[in-house]
């Protein structure tokens, strides 16, 4: 079963990108390679039990278990120690990636408070699109009555676009709500 977004890419985006940029080969058309969802636990970790809660929600959101990210060195002002868990991340590829992006664009983004579209500045020169989400509860998978805490996420969409312009066109054609500049 193919994702709606993957079908859209194969049927509409490839032909539109080939017409606009003049690619002679289909494989030269930029595509989304992976999505990385990560969160820094920071002060949440000081309370025991919050780690499991963060892992539970990230697993529900991404569809796979996130890996723990440990501090590489101790920093006294941040109250972190070497090896202490300071965040979690999940890298999503393939069919799961397209399913996540479909749910994200159609269900989660419209639930964001005061959302007017993502800024074009969120796309870097390498064609990667990074957006910060203040509340994890915008995802339909996290809806429940027993939400004890709210944490933010960072979603990075990695593409193999060679230029920023190619990436912006790709994301617009894929249905990402970008602001007009």
Which residues does each predicted region cover?
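Ribosome-associated RNA-binding proteins
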Residues: 1-181
């Amino acid at each position: 079963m193919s994702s709606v977004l993957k079908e859209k890419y194969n049927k509409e985006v490839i032909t539109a990108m080939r017409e606009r940029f003049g690619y002679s080969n289909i494989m030269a058309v930029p595509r989304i390679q992976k999505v990385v969802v990560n969160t820094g636990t920071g002060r949440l970790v000081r309370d025991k039990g919050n780690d499991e809660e963060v892992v539970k929600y990230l697993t529900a959101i991404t569809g796979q278990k996130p890996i723990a990210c440990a501090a590489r060195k101790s920093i006294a002002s941040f109250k972190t120690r070497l090896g202490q868990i300071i965040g979690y991340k999940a890298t999503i590829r393939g069919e799961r990636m397209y399913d996540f992006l479909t749910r994200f664009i159609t269900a989660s983004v419209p639930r964001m408070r005061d959302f007017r579209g993502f800024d074009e500045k969120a796309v870097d020169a390498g064609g990667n699109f990074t957006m910060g989400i203040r509340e994890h509860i915008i995802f339909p998978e996290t809806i429940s009555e027993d939400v004890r805490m709210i944490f933010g996420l960072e979603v990075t969409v990695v593409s193999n676009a060679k230029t920023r312009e190619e990436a912006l066109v790709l994301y617009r054609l894929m249905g990402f709500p970008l602001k007009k500049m």
